[in-house]
Amino acid sequence: MASATDDRSVSTTRPMGDATRDAFGRALEALGADFPDVVTVDGDVGNSTRTEWFAKKYPDRAYNVGIAEANMVGVAGGLASMGKTAVTASFACFLLNNAFDQIRMAVAYPKQNVKLVGTHAGISIGEDGASQMGVEDVGLACSLPGVTVIVTSDGAQTRAATKAMLEHKGPVYLRLGRPKAPVIYDEGAAFEIGKSIRLREGGDYTIVANGMMVAMALDAADALAKEGIECRVVDMHTVSPLDEQALVDAAAETGGVVVAEEHLAQGGLGSRVAQFLSATTPTKMGFVNIGDTYGESGDPAGLLEKYGLTPEKIADSVRSLRG
């Protein structure tokens, strides 16, 4: 049975690279000298979120408040009010759920320069089970006005997004995964908050995805091309704010849009895309997500298969639009 750190923990033909949490940790450590106002606030899980790499290099800029996520976010908000760029990280389920009131009142409402980093997101964390799986985190973050929400797909993009996050003034939620991620981008590939990336051209349908589902979207598009169905693939890494022009173009120029994400059906990328397109450029839509349910313990590949987060399910969703 594959473990959550095995190279082949997701179903894709693409080579595997760094886990996005690892890429974030190394990027933060490397960027410390360029961003002297950055501090980290940890909830005693820095060895898992990888903030400990920054803390070991800059111990006088790192704070550990213990297993107390609400207090952790409050401290981060206070540091930001004193001019610091506060990076605070925990498992996605604990950060967004346990500290939501503090995120709302100490970060989002006052527009503090706090960077919230949720690791171990989705069901792909594997054996740890439902209590540890952040499957509603994007929806919670997107519900807060003014919070930028980013979901990266591979190591190279995460390194670029970490730098962009530190440069951005205001609250950011960065969602990261536990397992190794399929390689999508070359090192140094351009990344701009709020600007999606078109990875594949196609005039029949569009697949919009983020996170590890980007690799599966590309695999699905390759499979569909063999059937004569050409799909555009868009990496919508920023969930809030959406790249609205890319969505209008997709709806106007192709025959329908399928949204794939490792998140609950409600509140995440699919909900936001559907809400926007229904009001601006109505089109046929399909959705591939976890559904309206919690996860369970199991190996990552098996869980992704069970919950329908596969290239095959994405391809099936595209085919369903043809009727």
Question: How would you label these PLM feature ranges?
Answer:
Residues M1-R175, K180, A190, ...:
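Thiamine diphosphate
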